[in-house]
């Protein structure tokens, strides 16, 4: 019998009600950086990015069969952007502006482990905010939890997000 191990985590809901005045320039990371919207991203590539960023943080919401994942990420109102460093995927974000009128949600955001610590997260978040507000909505939202990268909460607060609610949930652990 396979037992599912559950982890308790505190989820914080954030929102930002005005676009930041300044857009961050690409960091001097030593890489040639390219940010591209991945229109109709192949589910297998999305799953790779999701796993590389989320596995250590027990992300489970998009561990779906391929057809169901494709339906989620290819529906209207979803955009996925991938950051490439010297041609290799280094990070990504997903926006959803169809879920709630007037609001753009930063659904997923992260830097692949081998590219962390080089200033890419601040830059990528700045680009995510610019893309999210460019849609025309007045509010950006996101959620993070205590299983996410230890600097995530600080990054979002420094960017200008305000915590609006918290809740405690249990999530399935990813072992191995």
Residue ranges and their predicted role:
Residues 116, 142-152, 164, 169-175:
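Conserved beta-strand-loop-alpha-helix junction that forms the acyl-donor binding cleft
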Residues 79, 138, 162:
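Short acidic/polar active-site loop segments enriched in Thr and Asp
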Residues 64-67, 75-103, 108-111:
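A conserved beta-strand-loop-helix scaffold within acyl/acetyltransferase catalytic domains
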Residues 1-35:
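Acyl-donor-binding surface of acyltransferase catalytic domains
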Residues 133, 155-166:
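Conserved acetyl-CoA-binding loop of GNAT-fold acetyltransferases
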Residues 112-126, 135, 147-151:
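Conserved glycine-rich acetyl-CoA-binding loop
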């Amino acid at each position: 019998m396979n037992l599912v191990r559950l982890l308790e985590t505190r989820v914080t809901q954030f929102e930002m009600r005005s676009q930041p005045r300044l857009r961050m320039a690409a960091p001097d990371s030593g890489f040639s950086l390219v940010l591209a919207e991945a229109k109709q991203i192949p589910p297998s590539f999305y799953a790779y990015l999701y796993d590389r960023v989320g596995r250590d943080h027990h992300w489970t919401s998009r561990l779906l069969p391929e057809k169901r994942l494709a339906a989620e990420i290819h529906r209207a109102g979803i955009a996925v952007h991938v950051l490439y460093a010297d041609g290799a995927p280094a990070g990504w974000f997903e926006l959803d502006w169809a879920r709630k009128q007037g609001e753009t949600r930063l659904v997923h955001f992260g830097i692949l482990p081998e590219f962390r610590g080089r200033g890419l997260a601040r830059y990528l978040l700045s680009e995510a905010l610019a893309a999210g507000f460019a849609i025309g909505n007045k509010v950006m939202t996101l959620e993070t939890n205590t299983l996410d990268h230890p600097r995530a909460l600080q990054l979002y607060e420094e960017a200008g997000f305000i915590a609006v609610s918290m809740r405690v949930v249990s999530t399935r652990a990813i072992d191995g």
